[in-house]
From Swiss-Prot:
<keyword id="KW-0456">Lyase</keyword>
<dbReference type="InterPro" id="IPR050105">
    <property type="entry name" value="MoCo_biosynth_MoaA/MoaC"/>
</dbReference>
<comment type="pathway">
    <text>Cofactor biosynthesis; molybdopterin biosynthesis.</text>
</comment>
<comment type="subunit">
    <text>Homohexamer; trimer of dimers.</text>
</comment>
<dbReference type="InterPro" id="IPR036522">
    <property type="entry name" value="MoaC_sf"/>
</dbReference>
<dbReference type="GO" id="GO:0006777">
    <property type="term" value="P:Mo-molybdopterin cofactor biosynthetic process"/>
</dbReference>
<comment type="similarity">
    <text>Belongs to the MoaC family.</text>
</comment>
<comment type="function">
    <text>Catalyzes the conversion of (8S)-3',8-cyclo-7,8-dihydroguanosine 5'-triphosphate to cyclic pyranopterin monophosphate (cPMP).</text>
</comment>
<feature type="binding site">
    <location>
        <begin position="75"/>
        <end position="77"/>
    </location>
    <ligand>
        <name>substrate</name>
    </ligand>
</feature>
<feature type="binding site">
    <location>
        <begin position="113"/>
        <end position="114"/>
    </location>
    <ligand>
        <name>substrate</name>
    </ligand>
</feature>
<dbReference type="InterPro" id="IPR002820">
    <property type="entry name" value="Mopterin_CF_biosynth-C_dom"/>
</dbReference>
<dbReference type="InterPro" id="IPR047594">
    <property type="entry name" value="MoaC_bact/euk"/>
</dbReference>
<protein>
    <recommendedName>
        <fullName>Cyclic pyranopterin monophosphate synthase</fullName>
        <ecNumber>4.6.1.17</ecNumber>
    </recommendedName>
</protein>
<keyword id="KW-0501">Molybdenum cofactor biosynthesis</keyword>
<dbReference type="InterPro" id="IPR023045">
    <property type="entry name" value="MoaC"/>
</dbReference>
<feature type="active site">
    <location>
        <position position="128"/>
    </location>
</feature>
<dbReference type="Pfam" id="PF01967">
    <property type="entry name" value="MoaC"/>
</dbReference>
């Protein structure tokens, strides 16, 4: 089994030194879902929500979250992201919203946490904007879909 990289030999948490790593193009995609009642989803789709455009707000929140991941997750490095994309898709057949994010950079460490944080915060923003009309929405699952670049190689979730 692979060792945890954020734990030193004394068992203490530390930020990984990436200075000796090669710069490569790194990309990660993640997804999250927000399940809700049909009426709540219809309000989002038809734009009648009193707080405004739910998808636009969630998209911006996800982008901002990716850029601030290093401030939220203690051992993440601050990164110079070159791409953050947040796609939101209403899925009326399932009474939910699907969020897919993509983060990219050329650097020495991966962007998995940035993609996951973007998806999570976009989902939380949808909840925040819609909680006045429905409090029992369900967020999840949130998961990494793909990652590429870096020493550990590529990853793709089995769908």
């Amino acid at each position: 089994m692979t060792q945890l990289t954020h734990i030193n030999t004394a068992g203490e948490a530390h930020m990984v030194d990436v200075s000796a790593k090669n710069e490569t193009v790194r990309e990660a995609r993640a997804e999250a879902f927000v399940d809700m009642q049909a009426a709540t989803l219809a309000m989002i789709i038809d734009g009648s929500h009193h707080k405004g455009d739910v998808f636009a707000t969630a998209r911006i929140a996800g982008i901002q979250a990716a850029k601030k991941t290093w401030e939220l997750i203690p051992l993440c490095h601050p990164l110079l992201l070159t791409k953050v994309e947040v796609k939101l898709e209403a899925q009326p057949e399932h009474n939910r919203v699907r969020i897919e994010t993509c983060c990219r950079l050329t650097g020495k460490t991966g962007v998995e946490m940035e993609a996951l944080t973007a998806a999570s915060v976009a989902a939380l923003t949808i909840y925040d904007m819609c909680k006045a009309v429905q409090k029992d929405m369900i967020i999840g699952p949130v998961r990494l879909l793909t990652k590429s670049g870096g020493k550990s190689g590529d990853f793709k979730v089995d769908i």
